[in-house]
Swiss-Prot record:
Coiled coil: none annotated. InterPro entries: PIN-like_dom_sf (IPR029060), PIN_dom (IPR002716), PIN_toxin-like (IPR002850). It comes from Methanocaldococcus jannaschii (strain ATCC 43067 / DSM 2661 / JAL-1 / JCM 10045 / NBRC 100440). This is Uncharacterized protein MJ1680.
């Protein structure tokens, strides 16, 4: 009998979750990034998300927290290597902040959870923390909500 492979949770983390994880690796976003690097969850992303993350991480404002450019580029390369990079075919326009639509597009195509602290994305979810698009329900937890549920899931 074949051994069943564990199903891994698919996620899309927004830029602020990634940056928060780098600034405070011991915080909740840091735990999420650890889960991605340990390949306990699968992160889905896109070239436009990676570009935004890179742009923000390399900004002078954040470099004082994140270190020199070489260190940041190594982290971004490592993050890319453990992520599934897709080019979504969908192009939803449901967010007040148009830049946030890219997270929805990736999550929709990959059937992933969007982990975010972004107020615009959170405002789109229903009372059960789901965003419904074209009969697809995308879970949209905050980092804290995700970790709480993940810990229940694995225990």
């Amino acid at each position: 009998m074949e051994k069943m492979e564990k199903i891994k949770i698919k996620v899309v983390i927004d830029t602020n979750v990634f940056i928060s994880a780098l600034i405070n690796p011991n915080g909740i976003p840091g735990k999420i990034l650890d889960l991605i690097f340990e390949e306990k969850i699968v992160n889905y992303t896109s070239p436009s998300i990676l570009k935004e993350i890179g742009f923000k991480c390399l900004s002078p404002k954040l470099r004082k927290y994140l270190g020199n450019e070489n260190r940041i580029l190594k982290i971004l390369t490592a993050f890319s290597s453990v992520s599934v990079i897709i080019n979504p075919n969908t192009n939803f326009n449901v967010c007040r902040d148009e830049d946030d639509n890219k997270f929805i597009n990736v999550a929709y195509e990959s059937k992933a959870i969007i982990i975010t602290g972004d107020k615009d994305l959170i405002s789109l979810r229903d009372e059960n923390k789901y965003l419904k698009i074209n009969n697809i329900h995308l879970k949209v937890p905050t980092p804290k909500e995700f970790i709480e549920e993940f810990e229940k899931f694995i225990s």
